[in-house]
Regions:
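Phosphate-coordinating catalytic segments in nucleotide- and nucleic-acid-processing enzymes
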Residues: 1-103, 109, 204-208, 212, ...
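Switch/communication elements of ASCE P-loop NTPase nucleotide-binding domains
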Residues: 76-215, 227
Length: 230
């Protein structure tokens, strides 16, 4: 299912596979501090019965590692690899693009079994095409239409500011004042602005009607770069 969702975002991924590696090989895959944490967690969760099971997943932008142990048996480590098209080769996680690797992080919000989690994400659109960002939000809204899960995120992608995905009271702006302090306020503060379509909403935002846009002084930049105007 995860591979299907990833493929639907035009990542080129056709499948996922786990490859078992020796615990000693982890030293070549994860940083020393992560390797130490794994050792400490295995020690802290030593089995008390043969039926005891322990598992953990560790990931960052370069690796996706799973550790499992059953009873008094030796722990087993696996690394996630990806397959593309009909290729027989499996690719390392770190070989994927920044956007694809980041997309893995968002699978949690789509596949979570919880009905009341709040996910907070900074710069949702980072490394994503604008269309991908929009579809991700659309899927979240559909998956969690009947539960209390919430997605709170920041973005510089103004095209996502759409009534198709959000109510007016769900769109908020951040504006920094002259002292460097940021103020957070909702679109609902402009309830009489008449922006009832997405095109109108984006136009007013880019015109600075709602604030939250950078104040760019090109003349200062040109002067600093010795660029003559005209």
């Amino acid at each position: 299912q995860v591979a299907e969702v990833l493929s639907s975002f035009d990542t080129g991924i056709s499948g996922l596979c786990k490859e078992e590696v020796g615990m000693d090989e982890l030293d070549k895959i994860v940083p020393p501090e992560i390797r130490f944490t794994i050792t400490e967690l295995l020690r802290a969760n030593a089995p008390k019965r043969d039926s005891d099971k322990f598992g953990l997943t560790i990931r960052n932008e370069n690796f996706f590692v799973g550790i499992e142990r059953e009873g008094a048996g030796e722990p087993k480590a696996t690394v996630l690899r990806t397959r593309h098209g009909g290729s027989l080769l499996a690719f390392d996680f770190q070989d994927e693009s920044d956007g694809t690797r980041r997309l893995f992080d968002f699978m949690d919000i789509l596949f979570t079994q919880s009905e009341d989690k709040v996910f907070v994400i900074d710069e949702l659109n980072r490394s994503f095409h604008p269309m991908l960002t929009q579809h991700l939000v659309e899927l979240f809204n559909q998956v969690h239409a009947n539960d209390d899960c919430q997605l709170v995120f920041t973005t510089h992608e103004n095209d996502i500011m759409s009534y198709e995905y959000f109510r007016r009271d769900e769109i908020w702006f951040v504006e920094r004042d002259e002292e460097g302090l940021s103020r957070l306020y909702p679109l609902d503060d402009f309830a009489t602005d008449g922006a009832r379509s997405d095109a109108r909403l984006n136009k007013k935002y880019l015109e600075g009607r709602y604030g939250g846009v950078p104040v760019i002084d090109l003349s200062r930049a040109r002067a600093a770069l010795n660029i003559r105007e005209g």
